[in-house]
Amino acid sequence: VDHTLKSADRKEIGRAAELIQESVRNHGRLHVTGIGKPGHLAGYIASLMASTGTPTYFLHGTEAVHGSSGQLVPGDVVIATSNSGNTEELMATVLCAKQNGCKIIGITGNPDSQLAKASDVTLIADVTEAGEGGPLNRAPRNSILAETLVLQMLSVVLQADAHVTPEEYVMHHPHGALGKLREDEV
């Protein structure tokens, strides 16, 4: 965690935020995609960003090349996440998104990857020093944590720039403990 927080390129996070904000100002939308565990992360981040002021949609990593790319329009932004940055199915989705006129923000642990090269902005979620952890050092543990932290940093920048009020947040998240206005917020 410390390595990810220290190595995160805040300037590039700012560039990613600007790309998204420009798209939203022009009635574009943000989509988040990944394959496997990063696909689950994409669903979480899409929900988080949507509830905190940035219209965001989950884009299924493989279904996109089987018709779901119809949700993409020119000017949209797609965040694609992959530790290796070379996942074949994800790269097919990224190329499809680019052909549909979308800008790409790549989240990867590999700055020399296909994803990094295809992206308009690349955010590095590096786990080279720590590896993945666990007995086989293969299951995506640390890479998912690093990708989550980088995307959460981006979500904080977007939420701050959107100036989301407690009342607006509750409109997007009306139920549960988070959906109640606190006495100090009224």
Positions of the model-derived regions?
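An N-terminal, well-structured beta->alpha segment
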Residues: 1-26
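Amphipathic alpha-helical interaction segments
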Residues: 15-18, 40, 173
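Internal, active-site/partner-interface "lid" segment
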Residues: 117, 130-135, 159-186
